Amino acid sequence: MSGAARAGPARLAALALLTCSLWPTRADNASQEYYTALINVTVQEPGRGTPLTFRIDRGRYGLDSPKAEVRGQVLAPLPIHGVADHLGCDPQTRFFVPPNIKQWIALLQRGNCTFKEKISRAAFHNAVAVVIYNNKSKEEPVTMTHPGTGDIIAVMITELRGKDILSYLEKNISVQMTIAVGTRMPPKNFSRGSLVFVSISFIVLMIISSAWLIFYFIQKIRYTNARDRNQRRLGDAAKKAISKLTTRTVKKGDKETDPDFDHCAVCIESYKQNDVVRVLPCKHVFHKSCVDPWLSEHCTCPMCKLNILKALGIVPNLPCTDNVAFDMERLTRTQAVNRRSALGDLANDSSLGLEPLRTSGISPLPQDGELTPRTGEINIAVTKEWFIIASFGLLSALTLCYMIIRATASLNANEVEWF
């Protein structure tokens, strides 16, 4: 496997960490400190001697708002062309301010335009403060961003409280409001507990991953060593068995020279005078130069699959199938020229046929195109191992990135919003 191919997963892991580090975190905005606002509301209903009062503890000063106390009557925008205007975004937004009112506070709903536009429009009509209520019932107030609005105080409250106040104003009931500075809330930075959690989680993940990889490669090494020992044992046994097999030289008049006699099943050539042949225990005959490499690897007859080790009593309990596959590429390279020549002669000679060899259970020799997948299979195996290693690295990087984002992410209540 090439170095570039190995570097591919590593580049993915590096890219994952880079993406994590460049994540457009809203936590940077959320890390801004903010101040809570304590709001007391007094409602004077007609015909009621004692005014109704309630307190709002979940208000929040805007980021660019002065943190100061203010008091005044609450007013909502007048309808525009008969349509209620709760947002304060329209250029025609107006407020009816009674002549006896010196300080008043605008009540507006969030949405449709930026906080800066709403606050600036209320300030244009001389409001001393703006209270903006949320437009989503289940959301807490956020820290509003409204640079350039001057000295006007801006506070956000929940939708529920805002609509409660608005309901009184729509009935022409006087509502007085006092806004006081509450608690300063420090930035919500990466807490020590989160850091410990991320560190422990990542260490545990890496330990598990490393243990799995160590176990995997130990097993692989053990398997490889056992296979190599078995191969050496079989190789030694095969050499010993080959030395005990009968070898003779074909002479004139021997049955092997008969045209009807089976050809050598390995090289598919007929036997000629002075050829050295090997006679196996099953009585099958092959060229010595052809069958010896085969027996060294397979220790079985190429035709009937007889185990020569068992037949000769050398290794009776060790099957030849434990050995690795015979390297046909090496054999065919040594016999390539002769085999192709023999195949050409057999194709041109109608008196000779390959049918007896086929019926004898001989597996056809692979062609050159069939040998190339062996290298491809090796590459696939190596690629698979590197993929397993790289997968754990990539998974660890992504997990660490996810945990960091989760640990640093703040609640919606700590977000800074522009509109």
From Swiss-Prot:
Signal peptide range: 1-27
TM helices/strands, residue ranges: 195-217
Zinc finger (RING-type): 264-305
Protein name (record): E3 ubiquitin-protein ligase RNF130
Lineage: Eukaryota, Metazoa, Chordata, Craniata, Vertebrata
Glycosylation sites: 29, 40, 112, 135, 172, 189
Tissue expression per record: In testis sections, expressed in interstitial tissue and seminiferous tubules. In tubules, expression is mainly in postmeiotic germ cells and to a much lesser extent in Sertoli cells (at protein level). Expressed at high levels in liver, lung, stomach, heart and thymus.
Side of membrane Extracellular, spans: 28-194
Its membrane topology: Single-pass type I membrane protein
Chief location bin: membrane
Keywords per UniProt: Apoptosis, Cytoplasm, Glycoprotein, Membrane, Metal-binding, Phosphoprotein, Signal, Transferase, Transmembrane, Transmembrane helix, Ubl conjugation pathway, Zinc, Zinc-finger
Residue ranges that the UniProt entry lists as topological domain Cytoplasmic: 218-419
Protein role: Acts as an E3 ubiquitin-protein ligase. May have a role during the programmed cell death of hematopoietic cells.
Source species of the chain: Rattus norvegicus (Rat)
Pathway: Protein modification; protein ubiquitination
Localization: Membrane; Cytoplasm
GO biological process, one term: protein ubiquitination
